[in-house]
């Protein structure tokens, strides 16, 4: 059904474009090839939601944490301990479940950080994954949620993350959080997300051609509404144990992680590591460059459907399309 509907709408889009120029929802905005990074950067200090913790084994050179809406609902988290550094990104909740005012993404992030804080310093990647999984699984059992979440994976507490282990000198990447290790950059984008982002973009382009305005989009995102039912269903792909499943992906959700899907990077002699969530469309070697790239997109493509195609844009009253976290460390060896 999805391909048929999309095919029909694409034909409609092409027909209308032949009749008139493509409606430019970005009119009065200039898309600059060279990013304007001449900004007031004071917000990086004033609006930073992370309170720095120090480690004897590495120096935190840059860090920033900011929720898309406010600190209380921020589903990103940063952790620095003597032997670990981590950025954890709780997935946007697809259910109405809350505990003490916290949605599932926030709860997942906090549970993962708690597990990392309890890691023995020389733990390996597989045991680390098991401990995080067990922490979330135990929460399900404690709150009588397990049976329901076994049947409805879309309601699971889900998070992605990147973790640096000083003792192992490795970075462990689970899901679509990002990292830079020396000259290596891994965004770890999921193929299924690109498909959904493109579907949302097409639906919204048709809506624009049919007369929707920016004010209309602030009230309702038709592309997001179109893909949302599948976003709820695609959870069946996370930690899916079926071999050869093209679209499966690893996450922290309280169920066994397939270790062959976890990326493990050997740091070697490199000294600089950057960890971030996917709240940054592209990760750069400095916080300001990463922020500048993000701001260029937010200024010129607030719906996140052209310059940067995403499964969601900026909601009215929010600062960005997603929470964001950035952590840059230099290793002492």
Question: What residue ranges belong to the model's regions?
Answer:
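Generic short N-terminal amphipathic or hydrophobic helices
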Residues: 3-4, 22
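Short, flexible helical or helix-coil boundary motifs
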Residues: 17, 29-33, 210
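PP2C/PPM-type serine/threonine phosphatase catalytic domain
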Residues: 22-26, 37-333
């Amino acid at each position: 059904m999805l391909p048929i509907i999309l095919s029909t709408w694409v034909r409609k889009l092409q027909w209308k474009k032949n009749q008139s120029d493509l409606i430019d929802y970005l009119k009065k905005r200039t898309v600059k090839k060279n990013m304007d990074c001449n900004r007031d950067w004071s917000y990086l200090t004033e609006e930073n939601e992370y309170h720095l913790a120090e480690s004897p084994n590495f120096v935190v050179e840059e860090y920033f944490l900011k929720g898309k809406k406010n600190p209380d609902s921020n589903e990103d988290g940063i952790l620095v301990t003597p032997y670990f550094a981590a950025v954890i990104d709780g997935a946007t909740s697809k259910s109405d479940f809350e505990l003490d005012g916290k949605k599932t993404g926030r709860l997942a992030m906090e549970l993962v950080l708690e597990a990392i804080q309890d890691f023995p310093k020389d733990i390996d990647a597989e045991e680390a994954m098991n401990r995080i999984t067990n922490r979330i699984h135990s929460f399900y059992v404690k709150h009588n949620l397990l049976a329901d979440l076994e049947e409805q994976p879309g309601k699971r507490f889900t998070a992605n993350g990147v973790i640096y282990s000083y003792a192992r000198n490795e970075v462990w990447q689970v899901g679509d959080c990002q990292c830079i290790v020396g000259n290596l950059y891994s965004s770890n984008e999921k193929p299924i997300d690109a498909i959904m982002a493109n579907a949302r973009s097409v639906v919204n382009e048709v809506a624009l051609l049919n007369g929707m305005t920016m004010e209309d989009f602030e009230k309702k995102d038709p592309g997001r509404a179109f893909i949302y039912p599948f976003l709820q269903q695609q959870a069946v792909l996370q930690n899916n144990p079926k071999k050869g499943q093209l679209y499966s992906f690893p996450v922290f959700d309280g169920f066994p992680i397939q270790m062959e899907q976890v990326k493990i990077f050997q740091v070697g002699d490199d000294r600089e590591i950057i960890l971030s969530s996917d709240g940054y469309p592209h990760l750069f070697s400095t916080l300001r460059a990463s922020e500048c790239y993000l701001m260029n997109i937010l200024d010129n493509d607030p719906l996140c459907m052209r310059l940067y195609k995403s499964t969601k844009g900026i909601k009215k009253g929010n600062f960005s399309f997603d929470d964001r976290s950035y952590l840059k460390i230099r290793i002492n060896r």
